[in-house]
Amino acid sequence: MRPLAEFPLAPRNRIRGVLFDIDDTLTTDGRLTAAAYAAMENLHGARLLVIPITGRPAGWCDHIARMWPVDAVVGENGAFYFRYDPAARKMLRRYAAGSEQRAAGRERLAAVRDRILQEVPGCAVAADQNYREADLAIDYCEDVPRLPPEAVAKIVALMQHAGLTAKVSSIHVNGWFGGYDKLTMTRTVMHECFGIDLNARRDEFAFAGDSPNDAPMFAFFPHAVGVANIREFSGQLTASPAYVTQAASGAGFCELVDFLLAAR
């Protein structure tokens, strides 16, 4: 990972949009700061596409799509995208799986949840679980004392043994049935909503993230950026971003936005 200052001017000038994780990338210690929200506003005002790519639940993403200065949101690690059309007063919701498949998946996830809670002391079902459509979120440090890496690894192993795709974020371990991830639904929203083939135009977008569940995005985007706290996951990343900010969390996101807008 190179310092953000080494991101050359010419490719920065070609950036058309910024995609970003929310927890501990946009937020700081669980809070959305005024500066980070203003950074999103500044991107939107500069007519760049602004799209959070998050593990947070459908209930949150409905609010985000409606009320934040964003063009769409990908949620639950790629389970769906939401895009709000204010002129039509209509929310477009696109899921990776149909409603019946999601309902069946939730029943199967309940059994996995119960086993994890029994076998991994100290973990908990994430506080936002009731607002989820497609995945199981196990809290390992958001509202519980931080669990050791061995406990997090056991949660992942139990999910995988049950046939789930499992990803570790900075606060949760998320598990779901299906082969999708953040990148697959990002490709879908870009094609369906904006007519963009990301395979051909990936160099027109920056992605910012901070944890292992962002690895598919780090691997795909040549202009991927980690906020400084990504170093906490060194050795756990299957792919690393090209650049890293000096500042952590939301301040690192602001650093990236200022750096990109200064090139315009």
Regions found by a protein language model. Give the residues of each.
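Mg2+-dependent phosphoryl-transfer enzymes with acidic/Ser/Thr/Gly-rich catalytic loops
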Residues: 2, 8, 13, 33, ...
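Conserved acidic, metal-coordinating active-site core of Asp-based
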Residues: 112-206, 211-220
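Short, structured coil segments at secondary-structure junctions
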Residues: 68-69, 77, 162, 220-221, ...
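Active-site T/S-Asp motif of two-component receiver
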Residues: 20
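Short, hinge-like loop/turn segments at secondary-structure boundaries
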Residues: 68-71, 90-93, 143-144, 185, ...
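Active-site phosphate-binding/coordination module
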Residues: 31-128
